[in-house]
Amino acid sequence: MNTVVTLPTEQAPQTLENVGRFDRPLIIILDFGSQYSELIARRIRETQVYSEVLSYRTTSEQLRQLNPKGIILSGGPSSVYGDNAPHCDPEIWNLGIPVLGVCYGMQLMVNQLGGEVAKADRGEYGKASLYIDDPTDLLTNVEDGTTMWMSHGDSVTQMPSGFELLAHTENTPCAAIADHERKLYGVQFHPEVVHSIGGIALIRNFVYHICDCEPTWTTAAFVEEAIREIRTRVGEKRVLLALSGGVDSSTLAFLLYKAIGEQLTCVFIDQGFMRKYEPERLVKLFQEQFHIPVEYVNARDRFLAKVAGVTDPEEKRRRIGHEFINVFEETSKRLGHFDYLAQGTLYPDVIESADTNADPQTGERVAVKIKSHHNVGGLPKDLRFKLVEPLRKLFKDEVRKVGRSIGLPEEIVQRQPFPGPGLAIRILGEVTSERLNILRDADLIVRQEINQRGMYHDFWQAFAVLLPIRSVGVMGDQRTYAYPIVLRIVTSEDGMTADWARVPYDVLEVISTRIVNEVKGVNRVVYDITSKPPGTIEWE
């Protein structure tokens, strides 16, 4: 789980606010609390047009200054007639900028422009067939009867003046509407979700045909602009980066090294909770193959001592996080003066902290929050850097594309998510050297068998968990009393929800047989068939 901590500074930290933005077509998504707002932005970027998510409180004047080619109003959990329902600035309709309202966004548009919205006689949730009344404009190349995803309890009962009906469903008379003259559009369904078969075509129609955008948001353009901006900002100063081996920090290291070379120093803190052979492979890869300087810090004994006797998972995270800060502080001081701290902040982190990071007078970020792969409390007060955050406009899938384009090896680009506290939270209960060794060996077998069959990219995550109990078994003619290992293999698009993977029985059999026979201290292997929700992907 990613968490954030506040970085104390003497002045407002400097960030690369405009990396990846510059002078290109922009689509703004105003967020009304929808779980899909980020997904809308991702879908637009997949069409090679840049998009950003902003609060529904953004004023029409602020939008005018941003000069977007189009505006999308997201869905949300509220009813437009609710006492505390969020409302946008009504002057938005007069900007002359195309607007697309999605679900709640459509209802809000109708409500503010003089139409009527009421509680539906029957809510509509899940898949629905969309019947097209006007196949032009927004619905060009969207097939009649195509599937769209519905999730609403209110419906439009009367369109505002100037609007026409574009489409309906069996239970929703006004499923898509438009005021063609003012370029105002509304859809009651969610075109951004994967279940909406014609959704991508609709989004492309809005972005390209209605908003008249050009495909300028490309990986190559981002890399070129990011490198130029890094060089301009950093100059001849030194930059420090905490390298974890994940795709975010590795891509950041590659990008920075291309921009400023040996002005970059990477610090890799080996806390002893990584998978088998991983620390050695990572350091060798960066130092010998990529020739990027890495300061390796072996702090295994320190971290193990910090979690000795601890069984509560949150306390384990807290102690690991605090010790990481201590080691990082000591290392940075030993290596000399650095002006900048490179931070692998991604766009979802920016969205989550947007309301707390803006100065009410200027709109500038004044209290930057630092993403950490540990559950940490805060950096030391005398550890002061300016920030370099070149990836802060990117989603995870875009980071992978950037990493691949600048030469990051596929084993890192496609690395499955791995928690910051590492194996310490895949060992339930107390972490000991014995348990770490057992879990490392079992986890290695899982990864070997998955990789050998070319199945690694089929899963969001595939790993082993060690339970702090003993089970009875029989090996040879003797009874055993040893640990059980849990296999956790899931499929997912983004980690927010997940399903247990239907791994072939013969693969599970090989994994189980190898673990029981090759890993001393294990006599039982079980398979976790719990989805998320109700369970989580990790066990702690």
Swiss-Prot record:
State its Enzyme Commission number(s): 6.3.5.2
Q: Where does ATP bind?
A: 244-250
Instruction: State the GO CC annotations.
Output: cytosol
Q: Give the catalytic activity.
A: XMP + L-glutamine + ATP + H2O = GMP + L-glutamate + AMP + diphosphate + 2 H(+)
Broad enzyme group: ligase
Q: Which UniProt keywords apply?
A: ATP-binding, Glutamine amidotransferase, GMP biosynthesis, Ligase, Nucleotide-binding, Purine biosynthesis
Q: Which domain of life is it from?
A: Bacteria
Matching entries from Pfam families are given as:
GATase, GMP_synt_C, NAD_synthase
Pathway given for this chain reads:
Purine metabolism; GMP biosynthesis; GMP from XMP (L-Gln route): step 1/1
Q: Which residues form the GMPS ATP-PPase domain?
A: 217-415
Q: List the GO molecular function terms.
A: ATP binding; GMP synthase activity
Task: Name the catalytic site residues.
Answer: 103 (nucleophile), 190, 192
Q: Where is the Glutamine amidotransferase type-1 domain?
A: 26-216
* Gene3D superfamilies reported for this sequence: 3.30.300.10, 3.40.50.880, HUPs (3.40.50.620)
NCBIfam families hit by this protein: guaA_Cterm (TIGR00884), guaA_Nterm (TIGR00888), PRK00074.1 (NF000848)
Q: Which HAMAP family match?
A: GMP_synthase (MF_00344)
Name of the protein in question:
GMP synthase [glutamine-hydrolyzing]
- Gene name, per UniProt, is guaA
